Amino acid sequence: MNQTGRTIGGPQNGVNTVINPFRVSPSEDRVSSRDETPRNYNNPFLNEDDTRRAHNSSVSNSRQERLPSYEEAAGTPKQQAPYPKEKKRSSGSNSHQHNHHHHRRTSHGHRDKDKQKSKSRTKVKPPKNVDTIDKMDVTGLFGGSFHHDGPFDACTPQRNKNNKVAPVLAFPADGPNNTVGGRTSKKSTLDEVFGRETVDDDSETLNQLQDRAYLFNKANSSTTTLDAIKPNSKNITQFDSKMKTELVHGPITMGLGSTTFLDGAPASSAAIEQDVINHAQESRRKNSIARKKSLPSRRHLQVNNNNLKLVKTHSGHLEQKDVDDNRTSVPVTATQGSGHEDVVKKENTGNKLLRRVKSLKTSKKH
């Protein structure tokens, strides 16, 4: 077949050859059919390179058509071989290596033991039958040397081991420690709102005083605590710590109220009377040796004595005060000799001068 599509010759060697009118190279002249028999590459129109290329393509096509075998998929025997071992050393090196491995094993064993010991040290074993109060007891070297009956037993009384003197019985509800406070006078807001409050404060105070008087010197009705502390003792009296005694006031100062008793407590009336008597006795002893006064001077002193009054000063001492002249005299000196009292009066210098002038005028007239 020529370039127009005609067949040039018949079949050669059993291969149907068809000339491609669009061929570029002589290798394209030969177009194989799908059901052709084994090819003959002795084509006089093909050169050596075209023949080799055609052979390789046919081989690759045949390989693609069939599945790979197990050996091809698994690889070569060299690839399947394990990793080569190290070469064995001499006998001396073997012993050294054995010792080295043994040393490693022993070191690992020691490390494991040390770790176990450290863990056992950090983990503190809690003592048995020990609560928080037992741990707080510093008398025991390692804590919890013995069990204490403490506040936990108030919530769990069944834990109490000592039934005679137990901490639960230290403050019973009706014991003396819970009744010392007395009645409180705190007002309730609800009582005021609903009208349950007593309006009269005096009656409320009176009721409180009556209750206190009733509770005073009353024997304690609780026998549990008393029998636990002091058996067969029922003479403990009850007292009220809020009862106030009568305050004793001293001399009143200007703007400061009563004194603070820094110089001692104020004297009683009986002590003041006894002090006056003692001063009178001392003055009588001193004046017993002195000259007796004349009768006119005694009369003058008796008249002035009627106008004198005992006055308590700021310091607490007694002084004489003249009502008419508002003159203050020296402390009282009373004598009980001839039936009258001699009082030495302190006079101002101005009064003495006036009296002297009056006496001179009267003497000139005579």
Curated annotation (Swiss-Prot):
It comes from the Eukaryota. Residues 26-38, 316-327, 339-349 have a biased composition (Basic and acidic residues). The modification Phosphoserine is found at S69, S288, S294, S359. Its main location: cytoplasm. Keywords: Cytoplasm, Isopeptide bond, Nucleus, Phosphoprotein, Ubl conjugation. Residues 328-338 have a biased composition (Polar residues). The modification Phosphothreonine is found at T76, T189. Residues 1-135, 313-366 are annotated as: Disordered. There is a cross-link at K78, K187, K242 (Glycyl lysine isopeptide (Lys-Gly) (interchain with G-Cter in ubiquitin)). The keyword NAD does not apply. Pfam families: Pal1. InterPro entries: Pal1 (IPR013226). The keyword Magnesium does not apply. It is found in: Cytoplasm; Nucleus. One of its GO terms (cellular component) is actin cortical patch. Residues 97-108, 353-366 have a biased composition (Basic residues). Belongs to the pal1 family. PANTHER family: PROTEIN PAL1. This is Uncharacterized protein YHR097C.
